[in-house]
Amino acid sequence: GVIALEESSVMLGEVVVKADLPATRLTGNVMVTTVAGSVLSKAGTANDVLAKIPLVTGGDGNFKVFGRGAPVIYINGRKVTDASSLEQLSSEDIKSVEVISNPGPQYPADVNAVIRIKTLPPKGEGFSLSAYSNTMLATFARNSENLDLKYRVGGLEVFANGYFYGGKWRFHDISALTTYGPQVFDQQVEAYTTPVSRNLYGKLGFNYQAGQNHSFGAYYQAGKSRVSLKGTVDTRVTSDGAPYESLWQWNDGDETELPDHNANVYYNGSFGKLSVDFNGDFLQTETSKSSTKVETGGLAPDQVVLTDAVNRSRMWAEKLVLSYPLWKGSIEVGEEFTDSRVSYNSVYHGAGISGGDTEIKESGIAAFAEMSQSFGPVQLGVGLRYEHVRYRYFEGGMLDNDLSRTYDNWFPSLTASAQAGQVGLSFNFTSRTRRPSYRQLDGTVEYINRYSYQAGNPALKPTRMYTAQLMAQWRYFFAQAIYNHENNSVFYTTERYENDPLVKLVIFENVPLYRQFQFAVGAQPTVGCWSTQPTVGIFCSFYTTEFLGREKRLDKPFLYLNWSNTVTLPKGWTVDADFMAQTAGHGQNCYIKATSYLNIGVSKRFFNDSFSVKLEARDIFDTANERVTMYNGDILVSTANYQGSRNLRLTLRYRLNASRSKYRGTGAGSSEKDRL
């Protein structure tokens, strides 16, 4: 959409052009999209808004920034820890969305991209209610319900939220695993899985505004979920092209998350020119898993494999940030502390593996500083982050000194931006690290079927990343180029288990060098009632591996097109059409086949926008599927995952005296929550 503004020169260092200023503008190294007052404000929820932001794709809480992977998402500085938070936030409450493709020192060193959602200032007092219901129909039906209540009087706000999600869906996965050696073994695997999910979450909190300069508050959130899975796996094995063995497996599993606990306390205020932001967080989860796998056929006797597993995690975190005006800009300093522990316990009956008993304890402290200065149309910024991490790995209750480590790292950053006429330019460089997730570090071998096991790798090293980014904007056109250099990047791979050519172990490994380059250009014009946003890009990765004794270069680029369209009609009608297409190309040690989707939606608003109805058809041609071929030494793995992405959706939303939350807690330990 187009925001009508008067002609202005530089404002707060942002790229500001004339009255045809588009919804998205370049501010330093941040792409800022204005939602309030644009067609995006009528999109529905935060999920619907993010799907239309430049360089962002995805939906239902699972988003990717072009070439950067999954971002960390914040709402008013508070990290989003579950997808329901985006579904609960109405697009009419959103002021702007900021996309940072190369975050600076104020964010943990393992964060590749950040999306910051800012809401409009709260207004009004008294009681308010917001409710929605979303029904999705694919092979089966799924439903989500949300109720949001607030009460305000004076500087006090009390809020409560309830969220339910449940339903049934179906996965269809096809795999081919070929092992080359004296004999060529080929395994064709076809699996059908039907999960049934029920999730219930509740949240209660308060916020108090003490005058103009101080606010504090707290919230507590608890939830419980259960997923039941039933399915079949049909495996056919050939040796040098001749039939060798056939195996059929029936699965019945259950995964229950005991009531998890998530709490936050915060203080936000100012003392003269000094701004203070403090947050403390606690997170605790426990998940129990049980499964029964019945395997018949094949050369080995029939068998029944029983699995019982429990995963527990706990985290404490706090973060303090101080900012102060300095000369022609400002300086920001802060520290962050996290203390986490994760345990994995599993027992197998009837399988050739015994399970495991592992525990990981990790504590870390970080300090960071960033200074920015303005010199006319030019802005310069420098930053530095220091992280000290102590990692301890326990097996069977005993400390493994060989797998325990201590890290001390410095991460510098540099930012420069300028405006030359109607052209805005920005350059930034960062040095970061990405530590493996706790699941990637868990060495317990997990049983999938007679021929397939899965495990983490406790010997994994952190990935060191160096990233340079150049961005530009002219009127409603924008462009971005990023180069990324990684040492010790973590790849998925497959290897023989105990040298058995038929049994595969899916595991993670470090690779010495992995490089990426990406370039994208797009526009956001508006013609009458039609707002359109085409973006085209190219993504290249550079990696060389060994396959079948020969060097294999994996450097075929992806071509990318994302085209969002909104037509605003009289009497509250809106029509949306979004198209995405990506050609085949290489990424890491994989060849990823082409994928695409087309979504069309129609919405209508009633009663002064207090009630709305939206009907959507997602992935109309059922082409948003994942098809990947992975190269691993003498093993070739091809997979095709059909997730049932084609569906119909009906969303109803009602708002009574709707008001925005004053809660200003930003959260601590955001990166650690993701790893947990």
State where each predicted segment sits.
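N-terminal periplasmic accessory domains that precede
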Residues: 2-5, 18, 46-49, 83-84, ...
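Short, acidic, small-residue-rich periplasmic hinge/interaction motif at the N-terminus
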Residues: 2-39, 59-60, 68, 100-102
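Extracytoplasmic beta-strand/coil segments of soluble accessory domains associated
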Residues: 47-79
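Short acidic/polar hinge/loop motifs at secondary-structure boundaries
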Residues: 78-104
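Outer-membrane beta-barrel translocator/receptor signature
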Residues: 108-115, 123-173, 197-200
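Surface-exposed extracellular loop regions of Gram-negative outer-membrane beta-barrel proteins
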Residues: 118-131, 172-176, 188, 200-204, ...
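Face-selective signature of the C-terminal outer-membrane beta-barrel domain
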Residues: 201-225, 251-396, 419, 423-424, ...
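Outer-membrane beta-barrel signature, preferentially recognizing the C-terminal barrel domain
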Residues: 359-362, 402-405, 433-487, 504-518, ...
